[in-house]
Amino acid sequence: MFVDEVINNLKGNEFLNTTLLTKSNKNKLYYAVKQPDGNIKVVLPFVFENKNFLKLSEYKDGIEGATQRVIEEIKQEIIKKKRFLPLAGYFGRIYKALYEPLTVVNCNLNLGYDLWKVDKYNYIEGDKIYLMLRMIFKEKDSKEIVKQINELCNDLDKFIKKIPIDLLIDEAKNIINQKYLRDKLDELGLVCFIANNSKPARKYTEVRRHYRIAGPKDVNIPFECPEELEPIEIELKYGKKVKGLGIKKKEIFIITGRNAQGKTTLLQAIDSGRDDHLIGDGREFIITTKSLSKASTGSMEMSGQDISLFFQKLPPGIKGSPKAVYGTASGSMYMAYQIQRAIKNKTKLILIDEDNSAVNLLVSGVLSKWFEGVKSLAEIIMEDREKLGDSSFIIVTSSLDLLTALGDRAIYLEDHKAKYLDLTYFREELGRYYLELASKFIGVKIRE
């Protein structure tokens, strides 16, 4: 096979990681295959030595950050200086994932699976970095490909040896600080922390289409915690203090404001706080508990799920009872199940965005009470708060004033900046507004 020819001719290559060249790994881990455009893709494991890597031994808990930084430095050479061209597929459109930048590590979702990133085949150990190189060659002759691989490896070896170790140490410390703060949330009575100067806005590309792995937007308005919310300051493990907004345990925290002000973007950044980020991502110190659930509208086939926290009766066509539902769930039933399951599982933080929600489950109306027998989240907060258990809620609202009024604390976004929302004043204004509406409906002045 072609890959065997390449490997046989690479026997003199000192960087080839032959320990992985087993029969069981052939055509799975390492291979050579023709691409749709006629080019040849060769994937092989290599190992490069740098004695300076030994200085990272003190920072093993952040070693994945140092590894990813090495990979990103190689990518920047590719992008800015047009070096290591086989690793870029000579910039062919279908090969963008090979050199697309990435500023996220330790993401628990299989996002960007085709991006070059730290994993069990790309890592630093001792004085060596192990890299799985995905190379594209226009040539079809195995000897010519081997010649180019040897040149690439020699070039990479020289480049890796010149990467400043302080850059890698700083990145390892950065990851350790994020893990340290996430571990400290419980002790601080928090489920989330948003540091001042964080930059939540994301720039999406053909390859990075999900907010968890997208890079920072070029124009990015930093987050600043309003002083009225009493920002907290936290000292990190490695010589740095961060100040910002802490979301408390069992808190109902509201993010509101007009459309297109960054509410959903901020909520997505909070969700991304479960991951660790490289220096420059902008979300390094948006730190969130990993015990998190998102509730949104949708549909599913139910087979005994419990939604009795919200539903007193079931709509026609749905079998069972609110405690054991059978049939195709509506959007509100599905969302009710998500929230109730999260509470039952003692999930520490539940995220809700009005734009992706069944509104009748968040705030009840007269008709929903008549026809659906739904007890909304707003009613539960007012009357049965204890049924929400120990879960905190961060809820993005725009038009759901009643739910906003029931929050413990709130911010509104204006010009993409966080402003303090005085909920005491807001409740008074909302009460007057409701009285005014009621007076108009029944034609009688209702006194405050």
From Swiss-Prot:
Name used for this protein in its record: Uncharacterized protein MJ1628
Domain of life: Archaea
Keyword Protease: no
Keywords: ATP-binding, Nucleotide-binding
Keyword check for ATP-binding: yes
GO molecular function, one term: ATP binding
Binding annotation for ATP: G257, R258, N259, A260, Q261, G262, K263, T264
